[in-house]
């Protein structure tokens, strides 16, 4: 049975995440106005977003993404290592997190820091998480996808409820410094998403530079880049049979859910996400 770090009723994997760090993030960490924060629920495409943002910052030059690990370029604030790196870093910081809104640094909400929040169809998040967590030693293994569907719908998974995570962070969607992105839109029109991020960050890139960002952030290139594919961490034996990047597709859940599982999921989704405008989510 894997160890969990429990904080405010939510389980986190114990690999590099301590209660002390989570408390420090929540109550002590000071967000600076020039920081850029990348947020998403786990298995929503966070690393793809990091890669795109890093390449925008270098105008498509791949040297940085090919020589520095992705968790050093944009440290995970809830990890012990990431937190220590971020509090020592001078100047603008690139910060990544899967934390729910109520556990994030309170200082964010009085700062002018920019936030990019990435959302993915929770059904695909679920299937991706089922394979990822199930093939690692970080989380309890479900005996079937059906069991994992039950856990997910109740929020009994690492980082807690998808529904609560989304509802809370989306309350910021009208803020000027908040950019909402959907994984499905990123897949459908990656260049359009890259341009949207450039506009949000006030970055002007030439057409050839945009092409380089697109090229070096592709799924295949990322999968082969040891600085971005987490192969260096895989060697620590926390993952047994699967890499971080499995498919990266849209709609894979249809190959896994039974009709009754899909119906049960739809029922909970409608209940939990009531109140959002029609057409809010691109997968509806």
From Swiss-Prot:
GO MF, any single term: sulfotransferase activity
Catalytic activity: an alcohol + 3'-phosphoadenylyl sulfate = an alkyl sulfate + adenosine 3',5'-bisphosphate + H(+); taurolithocholate + 3'-phosphoadenylyl sulfate = taurolithocholate 3-sulfate + adenosine 3',5'-bisphosphate + H(+); lithocholate + 3'-phosphoadenylyl sulfate = lithocholate sulfate + adenosine 3',5'-bisphosphate + H(+); (24S)-hydroxycholesterol + 3'-phosphoadenylyl sulfate = (24S)-hydroxycholesterol 24-sulfate + adenosine 3',5'-bisphosphate + H(+)
One GO CC term, this protein: cytoplasm
Compartments reported by the entry: Cytoplasm
Keywords attached to this entry: Cytoplasm, Lipid metabolism, Steroid metabolism, Transferase
Induction: Induced by estrogens and suppressed by androgens. Expression is under the influence of pituitary growth hormone and thyroid hormone.
Superkingdom of source: Eukaryota
Residues given in the record as 3'-phosphoadenylyl sulfate binding sites: 43-48, 120, 128, 183, 217, 222, 246-248
Active site: 98
Gene Ontology BP annotations: 3'-phosphoadenosine 5'-phosphosulfate metabolic process; cellular response to vitamin D; cholesterol metabolic process; ethanol catabolic process; response to activity; response to insecticide; response to nutrient levels; steroid metabolic process
Alphabetical list of InterPro entries matching this protein: P-loop_NTPase (IPR027417), Sulfotransferase_dom (IPR000863)
EC number: 2.8.2.2, 2.8.2.14
Subunit organization: Homodimer.
Similarity annotation: Belongs to the sulfotransferase 1 family.
PANTHER family in the cross-refs: SULFOTRANSFERASE SULT
Function (record text): Sulfotransferase that utilizes 3'-phospho-5'-adenylyl sulfate (PAPS) as sulfonate donor to catalyze the sulfonation of steroids and bile acids in the liver and adrenal glands. Mediates the sulfation of a wide range of steroids and sterols, including pregnenolone, androsterone, DHEA, bile acids, cholesterol and as well many xenobiotics that contain alcohol and phenol functional groups. Sulfonation increases the water solubility of most compounds, and therefore their renal excretion, but it can also result in bioactivation to form active metabolites.
Protein name, as recorded: Sulfotransferase 2A1
């Amino acid at each position: 049975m894997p160890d969990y770090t429990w904080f405010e009723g939510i389980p986190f994997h114990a690999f590099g995440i301590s209660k002390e760090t989570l408390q420090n993030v929540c109550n002590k960490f000071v967000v600076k106005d020039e920081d850029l924060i990348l947020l998403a629920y786990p298995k929503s495409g966070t690393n793809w977003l990091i890669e795109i943002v890093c390449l925008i910052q270098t105008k498509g030059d791949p040297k940085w993404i090919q020589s520095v690990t992705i968790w050093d370029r944009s440290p995970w604030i809830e990890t012990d290592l990431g937190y220590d790196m971020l509090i020592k870093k001078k100047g603008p910081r690139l910060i990544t997190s899967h934390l729910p809104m109520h556990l994030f640094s309170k200082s964010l909400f009085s700062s002018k820091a920019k936030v990019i929040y990435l959302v993915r169809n929770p059904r695909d998040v679920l299937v991706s998480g089922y394979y990822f967590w199930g093939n690692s030693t970080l989380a309890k293994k479900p005996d079937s996808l059906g069991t994992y569907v039950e856990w997910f719908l109740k929020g009994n998974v690492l980082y807690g409820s998808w529904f609560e995570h989304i509802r809370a962070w989306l309350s910021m969607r009208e803020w000027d410094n908040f950019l909402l992105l959907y994984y499905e839109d990123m897949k459908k029109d990656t260049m359009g998403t890259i341009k949207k991020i450039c506009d949000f960050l006030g970055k002007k890139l030439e057409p050839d530079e945009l092409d380089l960002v697109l090229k070096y952030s592709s799924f295949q290139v990322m999968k082969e880049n040891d600085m971005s594919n987490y192969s260096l961490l895989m060697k620590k034996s926390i993952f047994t049979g699967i890499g971080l990047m499995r498919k990266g597709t849209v709609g894979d859940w249809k190959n896994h859910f039974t009709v009754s599982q899909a119906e049960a999921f739809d029922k909970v989704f409608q209940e939990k996400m009531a109140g959002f405008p029609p057409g809010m989510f691109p997968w509806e």
